Design a protein with these regions (language model features):
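Alpha-helical transmembrane segments and adjacent TM-loop junctions that form the membrane-embedded core
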Residues: 2-21, 44, 50, 54-310
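The first (N-terminal) embedded transmembrane alpha-helix
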Residues: 21-33
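Short, hydrophobic transmembrane alpha-helix segments
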Residues: 34-48
């Protein structure tokens, strides 16, 4: 029996000055927008301010995760600090969920008692938001194309951009038609958008924390690819999980044919897993005969699939 363990740095997350400037711009604008929202009493402005705060959190999570990812592993954290991004995303999603519920309740209360709103401050708030978001998008757009961590922050900013457009629509409808219910209606609608966004963030974070298989990886397909290699008789106890976004890990057992060269099989399998599926860290156990794994049937996906097909 032989084992090989290997790791590759791959693409390390990087915060960069663009991310930091974006965080500062968005943070300052959140304070201004929340002040305008409380002053005018606009549910749409307040809901967008909450989401702007979430965007600040998303950018800060990306920055902190990028910096923590560079910390070396130690005896207490043998995989390093990659999971900091996932924990931060879960907290961010929970906060976004709470904000969504608050906005929906505020909107429902305002439906029962609509109030006239000063539209000029609302338009100024939206204009400032669009300017801030355009600058932020320009700062991190290029980096988001190659960094999944930054891409998450980018989507937060895009959602705040949509919120600013909703404020403009609200202010213009009130100014030219006097239809006051547009504010709570759009506020509630945006609250449900926040609810949807929070669910997506929390679902993905929980899936990763539970060491779920990445969405773009099929264990069945990987097993078949391994068994198609020369010298591999069987692949079992295969596991794939993500330390954080885009950092995939794989482990598995390979039973090789009696006339096969274990080292050659190991090298070929390792290269295929890295090049075809993008695993940055792989642990493969090579066997000439299946070992006693009677206490681990529950976590052998390949065995469960074979039994279900029998």
């Amino acid at each position: 029996m032989k084992q090989e363990r290997s790791g590759h740095a791959g693409h390390m997350p990087s915060s960069g000055p663009g991310m930091m400037i974006s965080a500062w711009l968005t943070g300052v604008y959140f304070i201004i927008e929340m002040g305008i929202g409380l002053w005018t009493g606009s549910v749409a402005v307040i809901s967008d301010a909450f989401h702007t705060f979430s965007a600040v959190g998303g950018v800060l999570v990306a920055i902190v995760a990028a910096r923590l990812a560079h910390r070396p592993a130690d005896e207490d954290r043998s995989f390093g600090w990659y999971r900091a991004e996932i924990v931060g995303a879960l907290v961010n999603g929970g906060f976004l969920l709470a904000m969504a519920l608050i906005v929906i309740v505020m909107g429902a209360m305002r439906l029962a008692a609509p109030v006239d709103l000063p539209t000029t401050p609302m338009l100024w708030a939206a204009a400032g938001g669009l300017l801030t978001e355009f600058i932020s998008l320009g700062l991190i757009w290029k980096q988001s194309r190659s960094d999944l961590n930054v891409r998450g922050a980018l989507w937060h900013i895009i959602q705040t951009f949509v919120g600013s457009i909703l404020i403009i629509v609200t202010a213009l409808v009130i100014r030219f038609t006097g239809f006051l219910l547009i504010d709570p209606l759009l506020g509630i609608a945006f609250g449900f958008v926040l609810l949807w966004a929070s669910w997506g963030i929390m679902r993905d974070a929980i899936h990763l924390l539970m060491e779920g298989t990445p969405d773009d990886i099929s264990l069945g397909e990987v097993s078949e690819a391994l068994e198609a290699l020369d010298g591999v008789a069987n692949a079992h106890h295969v596991h794939a999980w993500a330390l954080t976004s885009g950092r995939y890990v794989f482990s598995g057992h390979l039973r090789v044919a009696e006339d096969a060269d274990p080292q050659a099989v190991l090298k070929t399998a390792h290269g295929m897993l890295k090049d075809k599926y993008g695993f940055f860290f792989t642990t493969l156990q090579v066997e000439t005969a299946c070992l006693d794994e009677s206490s681990a049937e529950a976590i052998d996906v390949t065995r469960a699939q074979e039994e279900s097909e029998a």
